[in-house]
Amino acid sequence: MKVKVIPVLEDNYMYLVIEELTREAVAVDVAVPKRLLEIVGREGVSLTAVLTTHHHWDHARGNPELARLRPGLAVLGADERIFSLTRRLAHGEELRFGAIHVRCLLTPGHTAGHMSYFLWEDDCPDPPALFSGDALSVAGCGSCLEGSAQQMYQSLAELGTLPPETKVFCGHEHTLSNLEFAQKVEPCNDHVRAKLSWAKARPLSRRGKRVGGEGTGFGVGGALRQGLMVTGACGHSRRGMRMTCPLCRRLWARSASTTPSCGWREYGCCPGASTVTWTLRKASGDCVLG
């Protein structure tokens, strides 16, 4: 299974997933169809379907033009608001494209009908892949525009049950801003510090791919699965937030004027400790994860 990462618009990612034996391909979140078709032609593959994570313009705007250019193309997703949708998918439904299996995972929070896609290939040594749209990004998650914070938390918890070797392909390039925010929230967290150094050392076009178990403790099978789950948000209040580490409390208070406001529902132990579990009271902005 080959994944082509296609940066588009200001900070979006489209993807082309190729089954290398049959040369069958599936696109994820088509925003710029002509750019996608250039790569389809260059790779010499047959595009058979589009997987759309959610209905927002920057993830689905290319569907109508692509459907016009490729009659009979399947446009799949969970939300009936998705442009040119040909079939609505259900949570837990499985699809197959050649040797590639797709498991559909409903992950509401950012939108009510947000779907993430877990892909793997038969008899292939390559790790499975998760196309998470705006549910999960590098060191963050999407804003809760339609769903609740609890829904987002549950969605992330479900993604945390995926195999630890899973590669995560997200919908936006927000790596540096997420990690810089995370460092202000968790100044004692060595994982955040290491991941930020990792991100700064990498070319921008590669930061959209997050590999679980890469050595920094981040990844679907790393931070999430080991209990280092931090779900935060840029909201309008710091009420209800408690940190047990005095240093973290002092640093957080000192950076209050420059750090986006956060509303936390519960408390957690020191961010530098082995486990951190914070849940949300509300979420109206990017979240910190891991």
Curated annotation (Swiss-Prot):
This is Hydroxyacylglutathione hydrolase-like protein. Its EC number is 3.1.2.-. Zn(2+) 2 binds at D58, H59, D134, H172. Zn(2+) 1 binds at H54, H56, H110, D134. GO terms for molecular function: hydroxyacylglutathione hydrolase activity; metal ion binding. It is an enzyme of class 3 (hydrolase). Binds 2 Zn(2+) ions per subunit. CDD domains: hydroxyacylglutathione_hydrolase_MBL-fold. Keywords: Hydrolase, Metal-binding, Zinc. Belongs to the metallo-beta-lactamase superfamily. Glyoxalase II family. It holds the Pfam family Lactamase_B. Its cofactor is Zn(2+). SUPFAM superfamilies: Metallo-hydrolase/oxidoreductase. Hydrolase acting on ester bonds.
